[in-house]
């Protein structure tokens, strides 16, 4: 009988919750600001975890670089807090990566909205010209 979810998936889901809470409540570095954990991928042996993050209200590349440096510097501290919060034999090594998918999704949505708006305006102008 196979399981519905692999253990690494369950650990990733729990890690996402714990790290989000830790970043919100425990990490006080001002360079990090409003950070969201969008996804977590855990290796099969649970030794490594890739944490995908986005920074809210911050599209400045320099601020994002500074935030990522701060997260990398705080990774051992975050890992120790995760170890206390979760009962794991091996607490995964945390590797933070910036998740561009949210920013790209918003950019694409804005492009579509602008195209639809200009198309409607063009049709309205054409209808007014026919009258």
From Swiss-Prot:
GO terms for biological process: maturation of SSU-rRNA. Coiled coil: none annotated. Keywords: Cytoplasm, Ribosome biogenesis. PROSITE patterns: RBFA. It is found in: Cytoplasm. Pfam families: RBFA. GO terms for molecular function: ribosomal small subunit binding. InterPro entries: KH_dom-like_a/b (IPR015946), RbfA (IPR000238), RbfA_dom_sf (IPR023799), Ribosome-bd_factorA_CS (IPR020053). It comes from the Bacteria. Gene3D superfamilies: 3.30.300.20. Its main location: cytoplasm. GO terms for cellular component: cytosol. One of several proteins that assist in the late maturation steps of the functional core of the 30S ribosomal subunit. Associates with free 30S ribosomal subunits (but not with 30S subunits that are part of 70S ribosomes or polysomes). Required for efficient processing of 16S rRNA. May interact with the 5'-terminal helix region of 16S rRNA. Monomer. Binds 30S ribosomal subunits, but not 50S ribosomal subunits or 70S ribosomes. Belongs to the RbfA family. This is Ribosome-binding factor A.
């Amino acid at each position: 009988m196979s399981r519905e979810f692999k253990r690494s998936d369950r650990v990733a889901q729990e890690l996402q919750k714990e790290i989000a809470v830790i970043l919100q409540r425990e990490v006080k570095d001002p360079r990090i600001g409003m950070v969201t954990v969008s996804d977590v991928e855990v290796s099969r042996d649970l030794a490594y975890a890739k944490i995908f993050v986005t920074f809210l209200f911050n599209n400045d590349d320099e601020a994002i670089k500074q935030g990522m440096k701060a997260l990398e510097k705080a990774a051992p501290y975050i890992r120790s807090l995760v170890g206390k919060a979760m009962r794991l034999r091996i607490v995964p090594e945390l590797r933070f990566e910036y998740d561009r998918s949210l920013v790209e999704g918003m950019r694409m949505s804005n492009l579509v909205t602008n195209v639809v708006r200009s198309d409607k305006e063009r049709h309205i102008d054409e209808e007014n010209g026919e009258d």
